[in-house]
């Protein structure tokens, strides 16, 4: 069976840390494909200002264009309504019913997962892969370990922990650094840097 993981996020902007995690998921877990899913109108960030969805999609597209096992979907970007994870998973399960679907996200999301819409459907439609993110407690901390076990027991699911080396950078830090005029070339694919410079983003 083909195994694919949806890697959802605002990707504002996509950076080398995202790409590093996607590589780790492919090679450590034997996945066939990572589908990057830039969010269109995420409910948890409805009140926050984020870069235009089509620009974020374009940055992901150019960042991964040379990677044979990476693809990018405009499914959520093209939606005019709020983007919910369960809805996206339902769509892709219907589209590729014989594919085994996974959802790749930060381990910190486990702490708020039960606030997500139709969380029971989410765990029915996919298997979760979680990874550590900079600025959040390590996955081995007691609170996240307890939450992992609680979710697994409650929803009869198995959450996979991707124990990958941490790339210490975040999109927030990159945006702030660009605003302050700092060099961020090391943290981004060259193609993404070019878009940011050409369109004067994050100033």
UniProtKB/Swiss-Prot annotation:
Keyword set, alphabetical order: ATP-binding, NAD, Nucleotide-binding, Nucleotidyltransferase, Pyridine nucleotide biosynthesis, Transferase
Pathway connected to this protein: Cofactor biosynthesis; NAD(+) biosynthesis; deamido-NAD(+) from nicotinate D-ribonucleotide: step 1/1
Pfam families for the chain: CTP_transf_like (PF01467)
Documented EC number(s): 2.7.7.18
Disulfide bond annotation, renumbered to this chain: none
Any one Gene Ontology molecular-function term assigned to this protein's record: nicotinate-nucleotide adenylyltransferase activity
Bilayer-spanning residue ranges: none
GO biological process: NAD biosynthetic process
Catalyzed reaction equations: nicotinate beta-D-ribonucleotide + ATP + H(+) = deamido-NAD(+) + diphosphate
SUPFAM superfamilies referenced in this protein's UniProt entry, alphabetically: Nucleotidylyl transferase (SSF52374)
Function of the molecule: Catalyzes the reversible adenylation of nicotinate mononucleotide (NaMN) to nicotinic acid adenine dinucleotide (NaAD).
PANTHER family: NICOTINATE-NUCLEOTIDE ADENYLYLTRANSFERASE-RELATED (PTHR39321), PHOSPHOPANTETHEINE ADENYLYLTRANSFERASE (PTHR39321:SF3)
Membership in a protein family: Belongs to the NadD family.
Protein name from the UniProt record: Probable nicotinate-nucleotide adenylyltransferase
Organism: Clostridium kluyveri (strain ATCC 8527 / DSM 555 / NBRC 12016 / NCIMB 10680 / K1)
Recorded name of the encoding gene: nadD
């Amino acid at each position: 069976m083909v195994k694919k993981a949806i890697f959802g996020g605002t990707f504002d902007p996509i950076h080398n840390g995202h790409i590093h995690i996607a590589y780790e998921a492919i090679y450590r877990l034997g996945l066939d494909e990572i589908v990057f899913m830039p969010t269109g109108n995420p409910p948890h960030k409805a009140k926050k200002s984020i870069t235009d969805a089509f620009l974020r999609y374009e940055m992901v597209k150019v960042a991964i264009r040379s990677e044979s096992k990476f693809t990018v979907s405009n499914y959520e970007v093209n939606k005019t309504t709020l983007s919910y994870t369960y809805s996206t998973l339902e769509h892709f399960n219907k589209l590729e019913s014989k594919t085994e679907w996974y959802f790749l996200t930060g381990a910190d999301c486990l702490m708020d997962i039960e606030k997500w819409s139709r969380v029971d459907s989410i765990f029915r439609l996919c298997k979760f892969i979680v990874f550590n993110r900079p600025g959040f407690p390590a996955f081995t901390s007691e609170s996240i370990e307890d939450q992992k076990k609680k979710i697994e027991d409650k929803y009869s699911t198995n959450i996979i922990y991707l124990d990958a080396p941490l790339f210490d950078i975040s999109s927030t830090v990159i945006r702030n650094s660009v605003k302050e005029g700092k060099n961020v070339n090391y943290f981004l694919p060259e193609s993404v840097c070019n878009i940011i410079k050409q369109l004067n983003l994050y100033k």
